[in-house]
């Protein structure tokens, strides 16, 4: 330690001089003592100075030491915190798979403790020794320390790293040169484009807009933090693949950028060869849109519509010629020409597929998958929706050959897999009819056409499907939805917003194109199967073409005139072989003339072997905005689970489009098989006009056995669940009626009311089997029962099991709602069913074996009946629903109708079920329903039996006046919704002879359901005390069964029992007639509240409870003998009939009532025993 700054004084100088001056100089000892004393004092003073200096030095050292120690402790604490927090940060970072967030997040949010000021690395609290190292490094790296620049010699290889000027000037010069080059190029492009712009678009406007757009790109990239935005702008311009503003199409910069954003466009959209010397097709464009009225559904078209007398190609280009190369090829064809169809393979190509044998499901599935994978490449230069209206065009028929080429408009959306139909997509980029270049794809043909091979049958028995351009053109804004699932589930979606009116599907798993028209035009073409002739089975994979429009241009007048002129035209289908973009060869097809008859044109455009189905008449079309009708497909050979498949040779058919109407006021002029449904599948029947054609062997609306794959109809209506279609189901054609009271009289006059089947449950209105719409049934309905139904399946139907789902055993949902209104009188019933008495008598043997089926599940709320067990509903004679404004519509009923009426009489409602000639239901009752199975399943399905749509239906209950009484179905004791399913198909059309002579068939069931009738009586009586809108009417509807308990306050009910008993004794005379205004009222579950524990009242909790129970047990508790064989029920007024199961039934009923009633204080006093 340096002590140089402190001067150490002499000890003698520090000492006091008097110490040695006062001594005697003569005496040496005295002088020595004085000098030593002075030196000692000086040393002590020197030690004091040293101590002061030491204190000053060590004080500073102590302060620095204490500061360092405190900072070390702080660092140790921070280190402990970091060690604790590190795993929680390390695990998410190391487990993160996507590191893209590292590039976009600034990183400050990860480190919240860091200061966000200027000094992030060196905060002010750093030690000075560390801060000095930062303060010294102020300047840039000292590049002069590098090696000197050497042009040649040993240091020349280090030029780039040793020359400082290269590092300084390279980046700036490159950026300046690039920017100048880009600006010059843009100016040249603007000048070039400005010379070609139209009158309305000046070069100055294009330059300024273009410059502003690039400036916008520049600013955008600067804001995003890109280092060199000029290069990014250049990359965006490189993607435009051409000049930014197209003079021919008039497309703007941004439109072209948006349209070319798909990477598939370059591959799909190739322009047609202009140098080929083959067929020339002039293309012109319509200068303005023309509003054509929607075709009238009832009246004929008014004037003012534009008539197209010739089939001509309307187009797009400024008289540029698009040429299609053709190579002649001769094909010898029969009268039955080969099938010419379009198939979706290799991104929609024109092809002719040879199918000499039936397509196997595996091959067709693979084709569908290949088509779906190739459709992803399908794209178009002009997507509908970008302000480019699409127009429908006509094809010009030349003397020798016709151009029926379709552009690639299979749009495949990656979200939904939407597939649309092959059509000539002629686009108008702007309403000002700017000229188009050929590369703008006036008629875009796919470069990758698949090989087109003529389909020539070995036996020469193919069918020629003429693909006419006016019938195959599409003009729409939104394509249809046909998603294809990996499990081959075809799902038909009905979008309310798009108002898709029709979907055509094919269960043969053929790669089939379908289109759902918008609200303007509809055409359905079904692809049928050839008749089995000569032992060969020709199943041709064909496609369905639709004509539709969503813009203001209507094609009604166009196709109307084509209908009038098509009879003498020569229609040629383009049939070519080995067509590809590389070879560039087309083959003209042979000419075939079609002479259609007027009957075929009027009805369904039916030809003997040319299965072409078009519209019936434009006046007969009823476009639906809310539902679809589906043309029934052909059956698949692989599906024969039920053993009741029909002969395919009898099913040469054309399925006509069944039009559904939202208001229900418009129907076709010719009678069809109409069904009132909401979202059900429909298979329309052929018209009567087509029956007069002898060439149509057997025209049937045959719906066959469908493919085993499950097909589901998905509707946007939330009340319509996804209904699985069973294997053997066929669909009845239906017409949606949202407002049944507004049926037009003119429309009703055209359709006989006896042919209307009311099937109006919106959830499970799947009706019929493969026999339901058979050819015999179609002929019988259209000829108004001039022919009787023939072989329609086995009468001895097998019983459907509870375990097997409907999709496996081919069961059908037979479900209806109380919209079915019974006939008004017994006389009318007898008059309606007089010709069918022999049918009723023949079915009586099957009725006696009828038992109740418990085939309901909670998910699929329809009766589980095998398709074999259902005969065609050919004589269902319901009346049309009549609205009664005086009576309010019934709420969703909890108990069945039989509980309210109380007429649990044994003499069979099941004969009335089969008495209508509809079905022979062999329904089997489950034995488990005896033991108190009074369930509240009705409340789980309130919407199933409710009358919706705001209609006031008067539900009349009628009584027969002659030999028999009207009796409800014994299935009412089950309490589930299958009671409704049976009661809705009971038309009450049996005669007095039938109802009384068949009364013995249900006597065997009396012992089973009589005991359960007691619980139902309690239930109905309790419900009556909650709802008393019509007390007088409900008194007459009290259950006509004996009370198990005698209770006070029931004198009036006893009198009702005596009246009913006297009525049963005089049953043949028919003295008592129920009021026709009886209203069945249901109780909603929301109206009832639960009873609290303390307020529960037990059944029969009265003074005489013990006595009455003892009397019951003493008299009839073990009386299990079968009922007597008399036609009348054996009612005893004084002593009720019961057994030991009554207690369990009553307990269950009481528990059910307490669960449903709720704790209502007003009704606690008057409980069951009132």
Curated annotation (Swiss-Prot):
Native species: Arabidopsis thaliana (Mouse-ear cress)
Subcellular location: Cytoplasm, Cytoskeleton
Top-level taxonomic group: Eukaryota
Keywords carried by this UniProt record: Actin-binding, Cytoplasm, Cytoskeleton
One BP term from GO: actin cytoskeleton organization
Every WH2 domain range: 1105-1123
Reported tissue expression: Expressed in expanding cotyledons, expanding leaves and expanding siliques containing developing embryos. Detected in unopened flower buds and in the expanding tip region of roots. Reduced expression in mature leaves.
Main localization, broad class: cytoplasm
MF-aspect GO terms: actin binding
Bias (Basic residues) ranges: 183-195
GO cellular component: chloroplast; cytoskeleton; plastoglobule; SCAR complex
Name of the protein in question: Protein SCAR4
Region (Disordered): 180-207, 356-376, 631-674, 701-742, 783-819, 960-980, 1026-1046
Subunit structure: Interacts with SPK1.
